[in-house]
Amino acid sequence: MRAVIQRVSEASVTVDGRVIGAIGRGLLILLGVGVGDTEAEAKLLAEKSANLRIFADDEGRFNRSLLDIGGEALVVSQFTLYADTRRGRRPSFSDAAPPEIAAPLVEAFANELQRLGIAVGAGQFGAMMQVALVNDGPVTILLDSAIFREPRNRHER
């Protein structure tokens, strides 16, 4: 599972000319589900997203999390995070989970954020969406659940 996390002062998602999700200060989370991803990974990434200290404290240091600031999250599914561009000019998306697997995992991710006490807005799975945001910083972080399976220290490999 992959998440592109952007710190925002506001963000919204529109489908068919209608805003279906909007947040103020918080995180826009573009979430891709890969083949083999599980609900455990959805919960792990949600917890990591909620607790990442990427908001400034009173001294301007990254010491506060989304939970600490009482921020919101806008979760938008994005299978294109699994684009394979190694061959040719047209990306392959064969590493992305099929919709019947991905949709419940995106929902599990959003539900876990809500369980942690975060107000969550969401896109519409499978729809053509327009996403608007005001980047704050900018701060953009990439999370990949595959990395959490690897040893943290190079010497542990």
Swiss-Prot record:
This is D-aminoacyl-tRNA deacylase. It catalyses: glycyl-tRNA(Ala) + H2O = tRNA(Ala) + glycine + H(+); a D-aminoacyl-tRNA + H2O = a tRNA + a D-alpha-amino acid + H(+). Its main location: cytoplasm. Keywords: Cytoplasm, Hydrolase, RNA-binding, tRNA-binding. It comes from Roseiflexus castenholzii (strain DSM 13941 / HLO8). One of its GO terms (molecular function) is D-tyrosyl-tRNA(Tyr) deacylase activity. An aminoacyl-tRNA editing enzyme that deacylates mischarged D-aminoacyl-tRNAs. Also deacylates mischarged glycyl-tRNA(Ala), protecting cells against glycine mischarging by AlaRS. Acts via tRNA-based rather than protein-based catalysis; rejects L-amino acids rather than detecting D-amino acids in the active site. By recycling D-aminoacyl-tRNA to D-amino acids and free tRNA molecules, this enzyme counteracts the toxicity associated with the formation of D-aminoacyl-tRNA entities in vivo and helps enforce protein L-homochirality. Homodimer. The gene is dtd.
